[in-house]
Amino acid sequence: MTTPATVLQRVTVHTVTSKDTLEAHPVELPDYERGRFDDIAFMTAMNLCLMGNYAQTGHFGGPLAYTPYNVACHLAGPDLGGLRYDLRNPKFPYSDKFMLSGGHNIPTCYALWMILYEALRQQHVATGDDRFAVDPNVAILPIDALGFRRG
């Protein structure tokens, strides 16, 4: 169940001090569209499972565990601690750099990027608006998954 975006959540985060005692820190979570994040995370998880099953490879525990983090980093925006970047120009020198350690976890990135690039592609086709145009040599599209670890 997701929390409505209009509700400001209050949570308590506990940290362990150097004296092995717990300290409580009340934190207010800002409003954001959690339902949309959950939807994209679900689609990303399903996409990476489909890719892995098609390629007959791997174990999905790592990538599935990283999926919510990956989605939040890419979609939250800098005001909520996310990346400052433009998906249409991923090599822009002044955008934030994204590195996910653990090479086996990269499928979550591929799965998310496919969803985001496909959304841009479909929006460009539907509207003709060049703001949604992406160079197909830069984009990672679903058709690209056919060659992942296959063969």
Where are each of the predicted segments found?
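Conserved acidic/glycine
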Residues: M1-A72
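Cofactor-binding active-site loop characterized by glycine-rich and histidine/acidic residues
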Residues: L64-G151
